[in-house]
Amino acid sequence: MSYVIDRRLNGKNKSTVNRQRFLRRYREHIKKAVEEAVSRRSIMDMEHGEQISIPGRDIDEPVLHHGRGGKQTIVHPGNKEFTAGEHIPRPQGGGGGGGRGKAGNSGEGMDEFVFQITQEEFLEFMFEDLELPNLVKRHLTGADTFKTVRAGIANEGNPSRINIVRTLRSAHARRIALTGSSRALLREAQKELDRLRVEEPDNFTDIQEVEQEIERLKARINRLPFLDTFDLKYNLLVKQPNPSSKAVMFCLMDVSGSMTQATKDIAKRFFILLYLFLKRNYERIEVVFIRHHTSAREVDEEEFFYSRETGGTIVSSALKLMQEIMAERYPASDWNIYAAQASDGDNWNDDSPICRDILSKQIMPHVQYYTYVEITPREHQALWYEYERIGDAFPDTFAQQQLVSAGDIYPVFRELFQRRLAT
């Protein structure tokens, strides 16, 4: 029984390459549609893709054709409606399409082209051109960061890695090299035999000697093995170091009593978007969740997003806990440290200068990037202005933005994590 092994990269989906080419070609249309979808959908509603509409006029291929106007002399087949010398009226232009309008009895057009993108494609366009700023390659982090790559051909190796084409090529070259002289003698003997049979058919003695010589040469050639151990060639595979960056993201969320339910929902949506972004784009990254009111506590993912605990507001408690965790588990010499903080800006007045002091002296010198998002439609309070002073001192590694409504989440997120050009 024979077996067919499908080694195609695309498997049974023969249209994958065409689909990828189509997505590249209409990237701007798809990207715009994804941004509109994000603005109207819940951030937590990411389990499916999106329908994309492209105007029919944008998918037309450019063609060369006769322009409108002018006069043409064309011979048409005869019919019952027209006779010789009559003028055929020009077709009335019209542009149909997917727009809303009144019905008409003339003209034609093209509807919008609608297709579905998958969840993976949706997230790819959603997070395109976003990255963690200042991510630095620091250390090789163990054997699991090595990758196996082809490194040529070897004369020894595992039988499962034998290179059949190179092996047969080597065997063929060896047989040609070792039997070259015998084959040349065989050709000469064959020519001599043909000559004797034509010119001296009665010379049986010489004919018999030449035939014996031919048999001897053929036997010598056939004694050479078809395949020798010298011919075996193997694919050489080596482990190549794959430097990976160790990164940790601290997520600090204010859950104090001043945070209304709507404000908390916006904060949760922002962090859910951040969590999706990190998990999709960075394989080796850890996330630390910290909730705070008058006191701060490290929690797991479930409790961070869904716990109903609340209280007063002392923002510095979260910063102190973050600094302790950094010192204990994430030394700056080995880790790329990031932080994202969300609050409504309402803080105990005497605590805001303490927050600035902790950030500027104990946290900012060790982090790659720190973002602060203030969720409020009101005027900024003391915490915002203290953080502005930090932004002046660390312009490359500190950023702050304001959120007013859920519609601001995605634009602000893109602004905070927009890919920067290397300097």
UniProtKB/Swiss-Prot annotation:
Family according to the record: Belongs to the UPF0229 family.
InterPro entries: UPF0229
Stored HAMAP family: UPF0229
Annotated region (Disordered), positions in chain: 81-108
Composition bias, Gly residues: 92-107
Name of protein: UPF0229 protein PP_0396
Species assigned in the record: Pseudomonas putida (strain ATCC 47054 / DSM 6125 / CFBP 8728 / NCIMB 11950 / KT2440)
Annotated disulfide bonds: none
Pfam families membership: DUF444
